Curated annotation (Swiss-Prot):
Cellular component GO terms held in the UniProt record: cytoplasm; Holliday junction resolvase complex
A GO biological process held by the record: DNA repair
Enzyme Commission code: 3.1.21.10
CDD domains noted in UniProt: RuvC
Organism this protein belongs to: Shewanella baltica (strain OS155 / ATCC BAA-1091)
Cofactor dependence: Mg(2+)
Name of the protein in its database record: Crossover junction endodeoxyribonuclease RuvC
Active site: D8, E67, D139
């Protein structure tokens, strides 16, 4: 029964989503957004670090997954996004959580089935997968998508490793 914290980083709004995995089922535990104030970037990064630290304290996750930086048209935006990711990753590392990273395409593929899915499609599928009464806000849905992607990816790796170890002299046991 692993608890996974997924994070969709941003310098102004950082989404988070927490799920518990029981066998093939994913159970929604919580989600939301860390909204930083309009102060300078170092202060916003501290708010992200403190916010993720509090979420880790509250939910006690076993694993941490975060969306990778994509190449934005604006280099300054990409740098700020990278710094926001760094603040979240440091919070996870301080809590001794293993950190996994996924691209937006990987996340959308795991949740919707196509890497080119729109935000509304991700929100809808997260609502369906986690049996939520309403679609979560976009940043929280993206973070829940990161957690779901991590769960599916880790399950696939476990299945593959099981097959690899069951093989003896070119035959399956």
């Amino acid at each position: 029964m692993a608890i996974i914290l997924g994070v969709d980083p941003g310098s102004r709004i950082t989404g988070y989503g927490v799920i518990q995995c029981q066998g093939r089922h994913q159970i929604y535990l919580g989600s939301g957004c860390i909204r930083t104030s309009s102060e300078e970037l170092p202060g916003r990064l501290k708010q992200i670090f403190d916010g993720i630290t509090e979420i880790i304290r509250q939910y006690q996750p076993d694993e941490f997954a975060i969306e990778r930086v994509f190449m934005a048209k604006n280099a300054d935006s990409a740098l700020k996004l990278g710094q926001a990711r760094g603040a979240a990753i440091v919070a996870a590392t301080v809590a001794n959580l293993p950190v996994a990273e996924y691209s937006a395409t990987q996340i959308k593929s795991a949740v919707v089935g196509t890497g080119r899915a729109q935000k509304a499609q991700v929100q809808h599928m997260i609502q369906q997968l986690l049996k939520l009464p309403a679609a979560p806000q976009a940043d929280a849905a993206d973070a829940l998508g990161v957690a779901v992607c991590h769960y599916h990816t880790s399950q696939s790796l476990i299945a593959l490793s099981g097959r690899a170890t069951a093989r003896t002299y070119g035959r399956y046991r």
